[in-house]
Amino acid sequence: YRDVRFSKDKSPYKTDAAAWFYHRDAWHAVCTAAVHGGAGFYFQIAPKENIVAGGIWMPPGEALKTLRLAIANNHEELRAILKAPAFRRAFGALSDEAVLKRAPVGFDPEHPAVDLLRYKSFTVSQDLTEAELLSPKLPDICAKKDATMLPLVRWLNRLLGLPPHSRRLRRAGAAGRR
């Protein structure tokens, strides 16, 4: 909320609507400094900026350290996800909005995965056209894009100790609560 009664600039504080879908086991950790909310999916509608995105954006220090250590030890798995033909067609590469210029502290600048270790966020996104946004098939369009991101999201969550979600787990959990 932005009080604009006495302001010359009457533009609203926020001009977009967004939704973040994160791991079911991470709900208690969202927006806390000590713990991360895990990787997930993001949907945004804004003037001239409608996107579907996924991954983990600016994780706290401990989560970022965990991810970097895992990448340093097994970067081939992440590279395989990023080089998958469907993934490359849809997203190209990881977003480069938050990348260090040099290797992070504690990592060898000559490490074969230094290009991946420099990332501070592990996200991908794709713009939605106005036709897609206004289409009655928008949920299907987003689901298809999210399915393409799913290997990255699952890989990140697995490294952070969040197991993959499945219908079987959901049914078993619901049955146990009755």
Regions found by a protein language model. Give the residues of each.
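Long, solvent-exposed, polar/charged low-complexity segments
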Residues: F91-R178
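Compact, glycine/acidic-enriched structural inserts
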Residues: I45-F107
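Aromatic- and glycine-enriched beta-alpha-beta binding-site module
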Residues: R2-N73
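Short, Lys/Arg-enriched charge-dense amphipathic segments
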Residues: Y1-F21, L78-R79, K101-S121, R178
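Context-gated lysine
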Residues: K8-K10, K14, K48, K65, ...
